[in-house]
A protein has these predicted regions:
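Histidine-anchored nucleotide/phosphate-binding helix
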Residues: 1-12
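Anion (oxyanion) recognition and catalysis
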Residues: 9, 40, 67
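Basic, alpha-helical terminal appendages of large translation-related enzymes
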Residues: 14-18, 25, 29, 33-34, ...
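Glycine- and acidic
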Residues: 15-21, 170-178, 236-242, 261-265
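Active-site cores that bind ATP or allylic diphosphates and position pyrophosphate for catalysis
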Residues: 21-23, 51, 65-222, 230, ...
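Alpha-helical scaffold elements adjacent to nucleotide-binding pockets in ATP/GTP-utilizing enzyme cores
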Residues: 34-38, 62-65, 189
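Long, charged, mostly alpha-helical binding arms that flank functional sites
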Residues: 202-279
Length: 488
């Protein structure tokens, strides 16, 4: 979003979307399609879309140039030894191979021969630079077993991100590359490739990645949760992905507003989710239609008595929103038989005057003994002052309307720790239960809502419709609770 803002609004420039598809073992067409779809959902329209694989020939030539100039070499050191040597600043035993030998092995890598598969190509930058990103990074490696989703089996070896990024950025005409601060150590490496290959300069602008408490953004760790079935997928409402927060109920206008307000700061901080969801509440509160839901568990039957009690069920049109008449009206049914939540019934005292929301006041005349409470009786007092009562309760008529089954879902953070360190064992910090569901009954007006609609259940909160009443065989509405910035 920041790239889109700076490209199109701040500087009247062009936004380029490039998909880095240099590892056929990890890249799939469905992933690239999901990225493009997510950007479209956020209203981001790149002026150009390209793939690193569009430039495989150019990258191959760049690697040849580095080898021929003595700035790259082939290395068959095993992964663990190479990692250890780089960490300790020790030169590889293959570092001084001749140019001719390196070119020969590069050809073997290209055809995927037995010898070629044992080797990689490393840039010959430094052995012991304090910045470990400069310690002879790998720039080409073999992968003959996985077909590339765009180039098939044409290539047996592929460039790494470290080589591909500066070469392709320069060639494609990128003027400003916005990179998160996790890549800051790689900036000198990026510049080394630009200078050594005599490429057009690219200006790098670092900004801090947006981090949140009790959340981790590592794709590798998130993939573990997906693969293990700990979450429902990449669009799970607990996931810190665009699709995840949208499924939780974040609106695109609120998301854009929040991100642009943060700006391209270099300060690395872990933010509380509160301000994120509070921004969303400002967006949805003025337009979310109000409805009622009563929990099915231990539901309490309420008998209405008194001269003002209706003889037969009747309905009235009431505003869907108390401050926004443009949203329309809903049908509210009144009768002698109501249902209320167990928690409300337990709070009542004999003789207490309460307010039955959208109807009026009533006196509690009887409360059935027992736990849970099964029934109560109330006498209407519609002349009573609703401002004088302590308790305002929601309710539904059990007569004169069809009550709609609903699932009310709520979600917790994935981890118990505010910030997960790199060395932390993920399993030890996973929240045991992160999704809870309660069955409820809603007023019949909710049957009109479809997936992604947002409503408010009075005294409960805001909910996004994950499945509409008619969207499936079960004839129920599935609702996901939307955080508001208070609590989780």
């Amino acid at each position: 979003m920041l790239s889109d803002y700076f490209a199109h609004q701040a500087y009247n420039g062009k936004l380029r979307l490039r998909l880095d598809d240099t590892n056929p073992s990890k890249e799939k067409e469905e992933f690239q399609d999901a990225i493009i779809e997510d950007l479209a959902l956020m209203g981001i329209k790149p002026d150009f879309v390209s793939f690193t694989s569009d430039h495989f020939d150019r990258l191959y030539d760049a690697c040849l140039t580095l080898i021929k100039s003595g700035n790259a070499y082939s290395d068959d050191t095993d992964v663990e030894t190479m990692r250890d040597e780089r960490g300790r600043g020790i030169a590889s035993k293959r570092r001084e191979r001749t140019v001719e030998e390196n070119l020969r092995i590069f050809d073997e890598m290209k055809v995927g021969s037995e010898e070629g598969l044992k080797n990689c190509i490393r840039a010959k930058i430094s052995v012991d630079n304090p910045n470990k990103a400069m310690r002879d990074p790998v720039i080409y490696r073999c992968n003959p077993n996985d077909a590339h989703h765009r180039t098939g089996t044409q290539w047996k070896m592929y460039p790494t991100y470290d080589l591909a990024c500066p070469v392709v950025d320069s060639f494609e005409g990128v003027t400003h590359a916005l990179r998160s601060t996790e890549y800051t150590d790689r900036n000198p490496q990026f510049q080394w490739f630009i200078d050594t290959l005599k490429l057009r300069q690219v200006y790098m602008w670092d900004f801090a990645r947006m981090n949140f408490i009790r959340t981790f953004l590592s794709k590798r760790k998130l993939a573990k949760l997906v693969d293990a079935g700990r979450v429902w997928g990449w669009d799970d409402p607990r996931m810190p992905t665009i699709r995840g927060v949208r499924r939780r109920g974040m609106t695109i206008p609120a998301l854009r507003d929040f991100i642009l307000k943060q700006g391209p700061s270099r300060n690395v901080v872990s933010m509380d989710w509160g301000s994120f969801w509070a921004t969303n509440k400002k967006e949805i509160d003025p337009i979310a239609p109000r409805h009622t839901a009563i929990l099915k568990k231990d539901v309490v039957k309420v008998a209405i008595m008194g001269e003002e009690a209706p003889e037969e069920p009747r309905s009235e049109e009431k505003p869907l929103h108390p401050k926004n008449s443009a949203i329309g009206t809903k049908k509210v049914t009144f009768s002698k038989e109501l249902i209320m939540d167990q928690a409300d019934a337990k709070s009542f005292k004999y003789g207490e005057e309460i307010t039955i929301m959208q109807w009026g006041n009533a006196f509690v005349r009887s409360i059935a003994s027992g736990d849970p409470i099964t029934s109560i009786t109330c006498e209407l007092n519609l002349k009573g002052d609703v401002r004088a009562t302590e308790k305002k309760v929601t309710w539904l008529s059990s007569e004169g309307q069809k009550l709609i089954p609903a699932e009310l879902w709520d979600f917790d953070y994935l981890i118990t720790k505010d910030k997960l360190e790199e060395e932390d064992d993920l399993e030890k910090f996973l929240t045991p239960v992160t999704a809870t569901m309660e069955e409820a009954l809603c007023d019949e007006n909710v049957t009109k809502y479809k997936k992604d609609d947002i409503i408010q259940l009075e005294r409960r909160g805001y909910y996004r419709v994950d499945k509409g009443y008619d969207e499936g065989d079960e004839k129920k509405i599935v609702l996901f609770c939307i955080p508001t910035g208070k609590g989780k």
